[in-house]
């Protein structure tokens, strides 16, 4: 979101000649069984400690919601800590529980996954076949976030991100994106053949163990 081309999606409040509060909304197209609609993702928000409790963050957030209404984006999504729920609830957001199960994995858990016959390689941004394979795998998912080629390239080359590819007869059949960043720690996303994904999980845990 922090890109000059995205300025229209950022809202700020200035006081004493400086920016003291900021809330962006990032539009993302969601694909569900062929149907498409746009959601607005709220993140990351912040207000300078010396200027909090003055309504600045709320003003920014509500202007983002105004933009969503004018753009016909029917749903807004955000991930936050429980302590901030009242702030968002005040502007119409509701807390929801997880819609799926999560399983924490430790490096030693690699033993529960089969390695299989797949060759595993690191994603190479300079190899167009790698990018094409990941795009084809992701775009075949019935439930997904739609991305442009440039957005794929950006995601896969973010700092502290590692992308693993499982190859079968020279073709990419699964991928796994793993992050070491403190704000997005762990597995970001993956897709493809189930057996190949299992091999990628095993390899990612072995890499963490090393």
Walk through the language-model features, giving the residues of each.
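Conserved acetyl-CoA pyrophosphate-binding loop and the N-cap/start of the following alpha-helix
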Residues: 51-63, 195-204
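Conserved active-site alpha-helix within GNAT-family acetyltransferase domains
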Residues: 19, 70-75, 81-100
């Amino acid at each position: 979101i922090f890109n000059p081309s995205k300025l229209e999606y950022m809202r700020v409040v200035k006081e004493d000649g400086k920016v003291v509060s900021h809330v962006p909304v990032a539009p993302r197209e969601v694909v569900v069984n062929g149907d498409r609609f746009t959601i607005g993702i709220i993140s990351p928000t912040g207000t300078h400690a010396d200027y909090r409790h003055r309504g600045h963050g709320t003003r920014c957030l509500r202007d983002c919601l105004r933009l969503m209404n004018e753009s016909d984006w029917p749903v807004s999504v955000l991930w936050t800590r429980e302590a901030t729920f009242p702030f968002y609830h005040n502007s119409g957001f509701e807390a929801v529980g997880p819609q799926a199960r999560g399983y924490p994995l430790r490096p030693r858990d690699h033993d529960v996954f089969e390695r299989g016959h797949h060759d595993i390689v690191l994603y190479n941004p300079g190899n167009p076949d790698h990018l094409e394979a990941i795009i084809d795998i992701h775009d075949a998912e019935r439930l997904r976030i739609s991305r442009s080629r440039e957005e794929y390239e950006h995601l896969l080359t973010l700092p502290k991100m590692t992308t693993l590819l499982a190859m079968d007869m020279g073709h990419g059949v699964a991928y796994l994106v793993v992050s070491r960043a403190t704000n997005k720690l762990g597995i970001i996303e993956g897709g493809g053949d189930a057996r190949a994904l299992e091999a990628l999980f095993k390899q990612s845990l072995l890499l963490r163990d090393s």
